[in-house]
Amino acid sequence: MPIITKISTQKRKGRYNIFIDNEYAFSVSERTLAEKRLLKGTELSLEDIEKIKKAEADSHALQLAMSYLSYQPRSVYEVLTYLNKQGISPEASQSAIENLIELNYLDDNNFARLFIQNNLRVGKDGPRSISSKLKQKGVANDIIQDSLYEVDDEEWIEAGMRLIHSIGHQVGKMSYKEIKQKALKKLQTHGFNQELGELVVDQLDLESTEDDQLEALKKQGIKAWRRYRRDDDFKRRQKVKRYLFQHGFSSGEIDSFLSGEVVNLEEIDEY
C-alpha cells in the first residue's frame, strides 16, 4: 500500500506537498492535512488518495467562490461561470455551489431583490431592462417576475425621474409635446412600458406659460427657416411646416410663425 514518505511546506502559506513512495503526489491545504491526519508514514489506499484529491478540489473551489462573492452579491450562474474560467472541474464547482447555498451565501431570490433595490436606489432602469440584465446573469424568469412584482409604481417613478429630469429643463426650447415625446422615448429605451412611462412623465414639472411655448416656437422656427434658406419660398415653407409639426407644434402655431406673427421672417433672412 502506498505510504507518505515526506511532507514539505510550499512557499505559499498554508500549502503542503505530499510525497508518496519518495515521489511527489499532490498538494493539500493545512485544513486537509489536519482533517485527513496526513503524517509521514501514513498508509493510503488508492481510494484514500482519490478522496483526498476530491476534498482538496472541493475546498479550492469553495475558497475561490467565497473570494469572488466578497466583492459583491452574485447569482449562481455568475459563480459557476467564474469557477469554470478558473479551470475548476464541474464536480468541484457544483460542490462549492451546494455548500454556498447551504451557508446562505448564494440565493438567486435574494440576489434578484438586491439587484432591483440597488437600481431603485441609484439606478435609472425600468422593469424590462432589469429583467433583461437579470436573465443575462442566469436568474430564472419566475424569480425575476416575483421580485419585480414586489416593487410599487412609486418606486419605479423615482427611478424614471432620475433618468429624465434634465429633459424638463427644455421648457422654452422645445414644444410641450416634443418634451413629453422625448421623455417617453428615453424611458422606453431604458425598460419602462408605455403605461409606466406616462406615470413618470406626469411627474415632470412642465407647468409653464404661453410665453414659454411661444419662445420655443420662435427658437425652433428660426432654426428651421435658416436651415432651408436655399429652397424656393414654397418648398421652404413646406419644409419648415413639416419640421415644426415633427417637433410637436400645432397647425395654428405653425401658421402663426409662417405668417410672421411670431417673428419677422424678412429680418431673419438679413442675418
UniProtKB/Swiss-Prot annotation:
Signal peptide extent: none
Subcellular location: Cytoplasm
A Pfam family assignment: RecX_HTH2
Domain of life: Bacteria
InterPro entries linked: RecX_HTH_1st (IPR053926), RecX_HTH_2nd (IPR053924), RecX_HTH_3rd (IPR053925), Regulatory_RecX (IPR003783), WH-like_DNA-bd_sf (IPR036388)
The keyword Lipoprotein is assigned to this record: no
GO CC annotation, single: cytoplasm
Keywords assigned: Cytoplasm
Keyword ATP-binding: no
GO biological process, one term: regulation of DNA repair
Family: Belongs to the RecX family.
Reported function: Modulates RecA activity.
Official protein name in the record: Regulatory protein RecX
The organism of origin for this protein: Lactobacillus johnsonii (strain CNCM I-12250 / La1 / NCC 533)
